From Swiss-Prot:
It comes from the Eukaryota. The gene is MVE1. GO terms for cellular component: cytoplasm; nucleus. Disruption phenotype: Impairs melanin biosynthesis. Abolishes the light-stimulated formation of aerial mycelia. Results in abnormal hyphal swelling, increases sensitivity to shaking force and significantly reduces hydrophobicity. Coiled coil: none annotated. Its main location: nucleus. Component of the heterotrimeric velvet complex composed of LAE1, MVE1 and VEL2; MVE1 acting as a bridging protein between LAE1 and VEL2. This is Developmental and secondary metabolism regulator MVE1.
């Protein structure tokens, strides 16, 4: 596809305001202004549809994970100037929940509200890990996301926070502390760029692992690392899987 055609294709995507980057601010009980910034550092590019049925639901099934694995960065700042990075000092737990949505409108420009499709399988929830590279921040990694049906989609990532310190809870309109104790609060959402899910016949194959995937794997995160490029072949050995050339690299394994 040439650049002109590619721009035409992109014009059919459903527009979203929080693609790739998103931010929000809040005020705590003690009057501190906190700003949350999320960025999709590693975008999903392609996937092979894993189909449906009992075989796809099996934990041991080859679910054809989205490639490369999406990686989302979170940074938290305190103050009006947003220069005081407090990501590593916040006394709270964070997790990110991924959902799948259509990236293109259906007939007549309408957006499908059907809940049965598209279907995202795998592990849609990730806890935050603190890494020093590529920059000191909190990261959410999704190495096990698959899509059952071919099409053009985007991932939506919703951040939830479980504050452990009462002083970090939200300030109410009356300026009083929230009536509830420790609870989980939705903070913000960021969306990925559109990506393609191919049928088995059209799937072009997997690409070499990105430098970012290798970087987080070197820091102990469980990410499949592809040693070399291996495009799809017409025939595979009986029982063979497209993930045979992958290895799970962790800091413990290399120790």
């Amino acid at each position: 596809m040439d650049r002109v055609s590619e721009r035409v294709e992109r014009g059919h995507y459903i527009p979203v305001e929080n693609q790739t980057e998103s931010s929000t601010s809040r005020v705590t009980v003690e009057g501190r202004k906190l700003t949350y910034r999320m960025s999709v550092l590693q975008q999903p590019v392609r996937a092979r549809a894993c189909g449906q049925g009992a075989k796809c639901k099996s934990p041991s099934a080859d679910r054809r994970p989205v490639d490369p694995p999406p990686i989302v960065e979170l940074k938290i700042f305190e103050g009006e100037d947003q220069e005081n990075d407090i990501t590593f000092t916040m006394h709270a737990n964070y997790f990110l929940f991924a959902t799948l949505e259509q990236a293109r409108p259906i007939a007549n420009g309408r957006v499908s509200n059907e809940r049965s499709t598209p279907v995202l399988t795998g592990t849609p929830v990730a806890g935050m890990v603190y890494l020093d590279r590529p920059t000191p921040a909190g990261y959410f990694i999704f190495p096990d996301l698959s899509v059952r049906h071919e099409g053009v989609y985007r991932l939506s990532f919703s951040l939830y926070e479980d504050c452990k310190s009462p002083k970090d809870e939200d300030k109410t309109e009356e300026g009083a502390k929230s009536e509830s104790d420790a609870h989980v609060t939705h903070r913000l959402e960021v969306k990925s760029e559109p990506f393609n899910v191919f049928s088995a016949k059209k799937f072009p194959g997997l690409t070499e692992s990105t430098s970012l995937s290798r970087m987080v794997a070197e820091q102990g995160c469980r990410v499949r690392i592809r040693r070399d490029v291996r495009m799809r072949k017409r025939e595979t050995k009986p029982g063979g899987r497209e993930w045979d050339n992958y290895e799970d690299e962790t800091a413990q394994a290399r120790a």
